[in-house]
From Swiss-Prot:
Assigned GO CC terms: cytosolic large ribosomal subunit
Spans through the membrane: none
Gene: rplS
GO terms for biological process, alphabetical: translation
PANTHER family with a match to the protein in the record: LARGE RIBOSOMAL SUBUNIT PROTEIN BL19M, RIBOSOMAL PROTEIN L19
Keywords from the named record: Ribonucleoprotein, Ribosomal protein
Protein name stated in the entry: Large ribosomal subunit protein bL19
Molecular-function GO term, any one: structural constituent of ribosome
InterPro entries xref list: Ribosomal_bL19, Ribosomal_bL19_CS, Ribosomal_bL19_sf, Translation_prot_SH3-like_sf
Family classification: Belongs to the bacterial ribosomal protein bL19 family.
Source domain of life: Bacteria
Taxon lineage: Bacteria, Pseudomonadati, Pseudomonadota, Gammaproteobacteria, Enterobacterales
Function recorded in the entry: This protein is located at the 30S-50S ribosomal subunit interface and may play a role in the structure and function of the aminoacyl-tRNA binding site.
Amino acid sequence: MSNIIKQIEQEQMKQDVPAFRPGDSVEVKVWVVEGSKKRLQAFEGVVIAIRNRGLHSAFTVRKISNGEGVERVFQTHSPVIDSITVKRRGAVRQAKLYYLRERTGKSARIKERLG
């Protein structure tokens, strides 16, 4: 039974997900339905957490919008996500960057990872 579930989940998983880590700046393009219209909406920010669980994998992106911190959790293999683009690689030493929630301004900056 377990093999059947694994096979079905494998078919549902996206193959074109780029490699990104916490600290990376990414742009996620999401399909949004407003009434009868369907359009793409971009959400750009820093990845602060990644949850790797196969088909149920998710990642959290944080950005500052109008001086207010906004976090959004995306399911990695969701059909709602059109594309994920890595804009900038960040050099961090933690897996979860929840400490960025308390920081603003220059202290919330992340060094760029080279190479």
